[in-house]
Amino acid sequence: MNSPFPAVLHQHTARLLEQLLRFEHPADATVQQYFRKHSALGSRDRARVGDAVFGCLRHLRRLRHAAGEGAGAEALVAAWAAGAWQTQDATALTPAEQADLPDWLWARWPWPAETAMAVAEAFKQPAPLDLRVNILKAKREAVQAALAAAGIETVAGRWAPQALRVIGKPALQRHALMVDGSIEVQDEGSQLLGHLLGARRGEQIVDFCAGAGGKSLQIGALMRNSGRVHAFDVSAGRLSELAQRAKRAGLANVQPMAIRDELDARLSRLAGKVDRVLVDAPCSGLGTLRRNPDLKWRQGPEQLADKAALQASILMAAARLVKPGGVLVYATCSPMAEENEAVVEAFVAEHPAFAVEPALPALAKQGIDLPQSDSPYLRLDPFHHDTDGFFAARLVRCA
């Protein structure tokens, strides 16, 4: 059972949840907009309301079973506050209800029966905060000591050599190490994608779907500020702060550029010239359910099919940039086969110049030893690896 919930916070939570259950906009944006309109709520109250609405989204099927299938936001919040999702008789629930997943998603859940439910439970837990230490400015142990001196506890990441996991929810945005570019927020799984690319000093790299540029910054640092990292994205808004972030990180080798789409004519100047290309493709985001639990309710199988068509087009366009002997990494933050191995295997079948290279040995060469797997792909999830859900394939252009 959750701690006592004051009536005024219950009311705010119910109003906000009612908006979220329309599933018209991303939950985090809706929550931020609500708090801007209700600025009188203090930071602690905002945190409690936010935790409650996201808790309701994480456990929505169990709460609906407890409160009644047609229950409105008020009843769902009451069930949440009473801890109904924790005390139910699991035998009265279908497996999809136990997992708090829509039926279609549970039917496609890509883990074996012996771990499928445990993975689903792990995806319902709030995500921890991971940091990446900028190796151009600091060492992990020194950063850990400096944070500890400020009362911020961290532990070293399990896998990535520059990862730190923050204990609790301290305010970090104004910490000197964040301000001077010594640390960046980046999930440990995302950091492993940068290592899988294996960029070396002096190389020419393309981050094809760079987004806000977190992996571009990581790759630029791993190259010790040499070579060139072309950070491309279709959203100029998402790229807008990357130049300033790169400057703060001490990087002069990261070059952001907004492109029209994957077929932008300006990309042709790099055709066949790039050492390594990272494609962190737009996807369903179902590997980020710890952070974005609304995603499991806001989309269905048809959205996966649409995403797969776009992913195939992007992968094909990115492959044109890779020079013979170069590396192409295709990644998503989704566990779904339609967006992952199906896309890669169809691409390789049509492009015999590219071959899949096993991911785990490539990471092991960098001292990153993940649990062994028969798959040539990198697959991460919160149950087995304590990261977000990721898929990655490492391909080499043979000719």
Where are the predicted features?
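Class I Rossmann-like S-adenosyl-L-methionine
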Residues: 1-174
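Rossmann-like S-adenosyl-L-methionine
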Residues: 141-399
